[in-house]
């Protein structure tokens, strides 16, 4: 089955035939977590770096934010028997909202990526691969069976 992950959303699957997909990642991040031993995959589409900006919104939807969304995602994997050493984490998105990145006043895409790296560092985890920054949107597809992450951006397709 194909599951579409919306903005500020999370999907996790252990069904080998499933695909997880999210569209139109601009400054948002599409973060995939894959347990290669248990064959489980998760895809988080988050918008903003830090849930301390609005704790009420984060309580209502933790997937809005990198930190609170990652906490829910990782907690689910660990609760279901994953070990941190078995997790493969990749990310795409984090684009600038301006062609000239220096004109992007808020730099949300960059801040999202920094927030993710800080969160992972604090959890003792590392990114395996990333495709972030630049200008333009990305679509991310995650195959549960293989753990492959495909990124479509501006007409090209690549695997992370």
Pin down the residues of each PLM region.
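Phosphate-centric recognition/catalysis
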Residues: 2-23
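Conserved active-site and cofactor/substrate-binding residues in soluble primary-metabolism enzymes
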Residues: 5, 38, 61-68, 72, ...
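General beta-strand structural signal in soluble alpha/beta enzymes
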Residues: 5-6, 21, 43, 127-131, ...
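Acidic, glycine-rich active-site loops and adjacent beta-strand->loop/helix elements
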Residues: 11, 47-52, 93-97, 133-135
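Conserved mixed alpha/beta catalytic, RNA-binding, or beta-rich assembly cores of soluble enzyme
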Residues: 22-80
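Short glycine-rich phosphate-binding loop at a beta-alpha junction
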Residues: 85-93
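Phosphate/ribose-phosphate-bearing ligand recognition and processing surfaces
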Residues: 96-109
């Amino acid at each position: 089955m194909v599951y579409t992950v919306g903005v500020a959303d999370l999907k996790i699957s252990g069904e080998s035939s499933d695909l997880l997909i999210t569209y139109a990642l601009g400054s948002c991040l599409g973060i995939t977590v894959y347990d290669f031993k248990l064959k489980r995959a998760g895809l988080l589409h988050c918008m903003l770096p830090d849930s301390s900006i609005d704790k009420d919104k984060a309580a209502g939807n933790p997937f809005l934010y990198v930190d609170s969304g990652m906490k829910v995602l990782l907690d689910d994997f660990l609760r279901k028997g994953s070990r941190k050493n078995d997790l493969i984490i990749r990310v795409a998105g984090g684009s600038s909202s301006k062609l000239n990145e220096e004109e992007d006043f808020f730099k949300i895409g960059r801040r999202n990526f920094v927030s993710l790296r800080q969160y992972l560092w604090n959890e003792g985890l590392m990114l395996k691969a990333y495709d972030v920054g630049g200008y333009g949107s990305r679509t991310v597809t995650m195959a549960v069976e293989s753990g492959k992450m495909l990124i479509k951006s501006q007409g090209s397709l690549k695997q992370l």
